[in-house]
Amino acid sequence: MAELGQKHALEMVRTDGADEGCVTFVLNEEDHTLGNSLRYMIMKSQDVEFCGYSITHPSESKINFRIQTRDGVPASEPLRNGLNNLTDVCKHVLQTFEARMKEFKEQEESMT
C-alpha cells in the first residue's frame, strides 16, 4: 500500500456507468515521451476504437490516458499489450545499438 501522499505509477479512473472498455488511466511522473509512443502502440490493436492522452498542466508530470475498446474488450488489455510491445521495441533498439557500437569500436581498434 502506498504511503500517505505517495502516488501510484498507474491509476485507473472509470466514470459511473461506464464499462471496462472505456477507461481513463492516469500515469504519474510521465510525459510525452511515453505518452505518444504508448498511444501509437495501442492504436495498432484492432480492438481499440479510441486512444488518446493529455497532459493536464505543463507543471504536472501526469498523463491522462483514455482508451475505448470494441466488443467488450477490457481497456486494461490493450494497455498491457501496448506496454509489453513498447518494451520489446525498446529492447530491440537497445540490442541493435549495442551491437553496432561494439562493431564500431572493434573497427576503430583494428585501424590503430
UniProtKB/Swiss-Prot annotation:
One of its GO terms (molecular function) is DNA-directed RNA polymerase activity. Its main location: nucleus. Coiled coil: none annotated. It holds the Pfam family RNA_pol_L_2. One of its GO terms (cellular component) is RNA polymerase I complex. Keywords: DNA-directed RNA polymerase, Nucleus, Transcription. GO terms for biological process: cartilage development; cranial skeletal system development; embryonic viscerocranium morphogenesis; ribosome biogenesis; transcription by RNA polymerase III; transcription elongation by RNA polymerase I. Gene3D superfamilies: RNA polymerase, RBP11-like subunit. It is found in: Nucleus. DNA-dependent RNA polymerase catalyzes the transcription of DNA into RNA using the four ribonucleoside triphosphates as substrates. Common core component of RNA polymerases I and III which synthesize ribosomal RNA precursors and small RNAs, such as 5S rRNA and tRNAs, respectively. Belongs to the archaeal Rpo11/eukaryotic RPB11/RPC19 RNA polymerase subunit family. Component of the RNA polymerase I (Pol I) and RNA polymerase III (Pol III) complexes consisting of at least 13 and 17 subunits, respectively. This is DNA-directed RNA polymerases I and III subunit RPAC2.
